[in-house]
A protein has these predicted regions:
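Short, compositionally biased leader-like segments
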Residues: 1-6, 89-93
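Conserved beta-strand hairpin/beta-sheet module of binuclear metal-dependent hydrolase folds
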Residues: 2-57
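Metallo-beta-lactamase
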Residues: 6, 94-138
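Short coil/turn segments at beta-strand junctions that form active-site/ligand-binding loops
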Residues: 37, 63-64, 128
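Short catalytic-loop micro-motif centered on adjacent basic/acidic residues
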Residues: 39-42, 67-70, 131-132
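Structured loop/turn residues at secondary-structure junctions
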Residues: 44, 73, 135-137
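Active-site metal-binding motif and surrounding structural segment of the metallo-beta-lactamase
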Residues: 48-94
C-alpha cells in the first residue's frame, strides 16, 4: 500500500498508523493541501517519523511547506511534529492555546513559529482561507 495518494490534484493524503497492543494498528491520515502556501494538516503518530517525512518529501520539498496545522494535541495527530519541523524550517505551527499547552509538556514547540487560532477564526494561506471549528468532543 502506498504511503501517499491524492484525493484531488491539490490535496494529498499521507498514511501512518499507531500500534494498538492486542489489536494491531490504528490507521491515521494526514493531509497536504498544495497551493501558494502549502499546508500540512496533522503530523502523524510519531511512530515511524522517518517514513512519514519521506512520504511528505515525495509530495513536496519540506522547505516549501508554510503551515503545519495540528488539529488537536492527541499523539496520533501531533506525534511527528518535531520531525516535520526539523525538515520544514519555514513552516509555522498552527494551534489553539490549549493544544499549545498540552504539546509543550511532550514536545519542543518553537514559540516564535506558532500561530494561535481559535474556533470560528480563519487563516489566510494564500489561495484559500482555512476555518477552524471545535468538534463536539473536544
Amino acid at each position: 500500500m502506498d504511503a501517499t495518494f491524492r484525493i484531488r490534484p491539490d490535496v494529498a493524503v499521507i498514511r501512518s498508523s499507531e500500534p494498538v497492543p492486542g489489536v494491531g494498528f490504528l490507521p491515521v491520515r494526514s493531509f497536504l493541501l498544495l497551493g501558494s502556501e502549502p499546508v500540512l494538516l496533522d503530523t502523524g503518530t510519531g511512530h515511524g517519523s522517518d517514513a512519514f517525512v519521506a512520504a511528505l518529501e515525495s509530495l513536496i520539498d519540506p522547505h516549501d511547506l508554510r503551515w503545519i496545522v495540528v488539529s488537536h494535541a492527541d499523539g496520533d495527530h501531533s506525534g511527528g511534529l518535531e520531525a516535520v519541523l526539523r525538515r520544514a524550517p519555514k513552516a509555522r505551527v498552527v494551534l489553539n492555546q490549549v493544544s499549545t499547552g498540552k504539546l509543550s509538556s511532550t514536545h519542543t514547540i518553537p514559540m516564535p513559529r506558532v500561530t494561535w487560532v481559535n474556533a470560528g477564526e480563519g487563516l489566510d494561506v494564500g489561495d484559500r482561507v482555512l476555518r477552524f471549528f471545535r468538534p463536539p468532543m473536544y
